[in-house]
């Protein structure tokens, strides 16, 4: 199975269940939410790449003027539209490498290692830069190399036995591939950016 097929089979629903998450992963997810609220411009226009079921934008509803979430998986977008409590939130099915939007945004997000599961990272980064052109407004969170042990346990809890671990990725028996990064590799892919640690297992890159 490809990553697209694994997500279509409902991996995200299981992964967001705290009962499946090792403590290091739960701590990262909590810290990511706090950072996001600190960094997203108040009353800003925000686009979320790989938004899943919309949890990040829904969590920011009280501080943003507009939120647009995009994801290729229509079942997640349908659930995001069902869950949204109203307000200026919009969720749509789209290819993250060719987003059908022309508006300018104050921030572009790609969170919770979504970027680390995408095949064409540079094309997606290009779209993030197009929609949020100001330096420092593209926010990407990815797993660090130190995340391998808790992620291995997490994926096992999700029914995805790990069959391969390299310096750059974990591969499971179901075909799911999730990458991890060093600061050097992040800079080689993103270019000029500010990188900060999120707990012990992840990085935030502001590009």
Name each model feature, range by range.
Residues 1-41, 43-52, 139-164:
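Conserved class I S-adenosyl-L-methionine
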Residues 53-98:
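Class I SAM-dependent methyltransferase SAM/SAH-binding core
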Residues 97-108:
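A short acidic, Gly/Pro-enriched loop at the edge of an enzyme's catalytic core
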Residues 116-128:
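A short, conserved alpha-helix within the catalytic core of class I
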Residues 132-138:
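Short glycine-dipeptide loop
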Residues 173-192:
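Short alpha-helix
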């Amino acid at each position: 199975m490809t990553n697209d097929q694994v997500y279509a089979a409902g991996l995200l629903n299981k992964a967001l269940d705290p009962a499946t998450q090792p403590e290091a992963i739960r701590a990262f997810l909590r810290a990511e939410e706090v950072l996001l609220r600190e960094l997203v411009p108040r009353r800003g226009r925000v686009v979320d790449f790989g938004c899943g079921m919309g949890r990040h934008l829904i969590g920011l509803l009280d501080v943003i003027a507009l939120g647009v979430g995009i994801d290729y998986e229509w079942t997640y977008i349908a659930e995001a539209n069902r869950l949204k409590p109203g307000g200026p939130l919009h969720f749509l099915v789209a290819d993250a490498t060719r987003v059908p939007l022309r508006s300018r945004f104050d921030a572009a997000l790609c969170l919770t290692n979504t970027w680390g599961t995408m095949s064409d990272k540079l094309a997606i980064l290009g779209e993030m830069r197009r929609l949020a052109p100001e330096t420092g407004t593209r926010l990407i969170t990815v797993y660090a190399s130190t995340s391998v042990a808790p992620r291995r346990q997490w994926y096992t809890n999700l029914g995805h036995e790990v069959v391969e671990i390299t310096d750059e990725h974990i591969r499971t028996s179901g075909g799911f591939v999730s990458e991890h990064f060093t600061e050097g590799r992040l800079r080689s892919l993103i270019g000029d950016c500010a990188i900060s640690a999120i707990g012990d297992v992840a990085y935030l890159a502001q590009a």
